[in-house]
Amino acid sequence: MNPIKELSPADYNKIFELSQFAFQYKLSEADLLKKKEEADRHTIWGWMEEEEIAAKLHLIPLSVYINGKTFDIGGISSVATWPEYRRNGMVKDLLAHALKYMKENGQTLSYLHPFSVPFYRRFGWEVAFDEKHYTIPMEALKQKWDTAGCVRRTPVNIELFHTIYTDFAKQFNGALTRDEKWWKQRVLAKGTMMAVCYDDSNQAEGYIFYNVKDKQFEVKEFVYLSLNGWKLLLNFIANHDSMANEVKMVVPENDKLPLLIDEPRFKQTIEPYFMARIVDVPEFLSIYPFEELPDVSMQLHVEDSFVPENSGTYEISGTDGNVTISNLNTNLSGSEGMHCTVQQLTSMLLGYKRPQELAELELIYGDRHTIEKIEKLIPMKQTFFADYF
């Protein structure tokens, strides 16, 4: 008998009892109710031991932008095991079950926030998103910003925020497509201040969510669509100099704020954030928006030890800018083409790392001409994930 069972709302109390223990937090009655409402969109599986939940995994149906195209993904969350059942392979089996479900439901990609990067690498996930953390002395932002327009504090306006966010998110690979429920449940926290910047034609160019407490200006979300909008928001932050001594914010890894300010020597750290995994390699390759090249022909050898049906040799070919993928259903023998694991394939196709970088580190290998071809085929776009689950 399969010990993995899909759980229902009747199991919510036991589900969140395990979550609170495993992740060491305590929910009030109101917070528990909110968690249960959020869980209504989840598919939750439990590894059952005599009708009790020994381990569990949540899967959230989401979609993201990759090179301007929308991809359905499965977000893995709240993976937990009671201590007396740990190290029995329950999480491994739950992950395998979730990957099979995702493939059957057209979710060709999966995200998760790891408690341990090495643990999830064993099952095919790879770091695909970094965060750059800034701690900026307020004094560093007090300069003439040369802006046109204004910033206005605002109450919640999901329609406006969503319009701005969507245009911003499409500039990156892997950013979430948010629906109204996600905005309400996951983004718009109670007590957060909000402001929108407008150009001199009264067109919205960005927004900021923030808190000011204990002499610190904490940016919760910082979104802009133009250089003018960026500067308007920076000037808005600087105008809080009587209330805060420093500013904390998280930005994309390629953020260029240090080039804009007179004194760029402030604390900047880059930290690995979310991991990703291609669930269905042949399907993902077939729908991935490669760059259009006049003529291309190459072989891609993929190894996936956890989902063996992904392993094989794929022919990437194209004429007149149309790229096609053929699954040759062969093993990984032969030296021609490029050889990689599913982890590094995910890293490359999301744009987190370039093929040339990985080849230099011997994380992928192949003949020089093939590496050069795949380098040209994969669009260059920064990865960024502003959400959490």
Question: Across the structure, where does each feature detected by a protein language model lie?
Answer:
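Conserved acetyl-CoA pyrophosphate-binding loop and the N-cap/start of the following alpha-helix
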Residues: 85-97, 228-232
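Conserved active-site tyrosine of GNAT-family acetyltransferases
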Residues: 120, 125
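Active-site/acyl-donor-binding loops of N-acyltransferases
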Residues: 126-143, 221-228, 235-337, 342-344, ...
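Conserved GNAT acetyl-CoA-binding A-motif
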Residues: 95, 100-114, 242-252
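Short amphipathic alpha-helix that is part of the acyltransferase structural core
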Residues: 1-61, 68-75, 141-180, 213-217
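Amide-forming acyltransferase catalytic core, primarily the GNAT-like/NAT-type
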Residues: 131-220, 224-240, 282-294, 298
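Short loop/turn motifs at secondary-structure junctions and domain boundaries
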Residues: 35-41, 186-190, 347-349
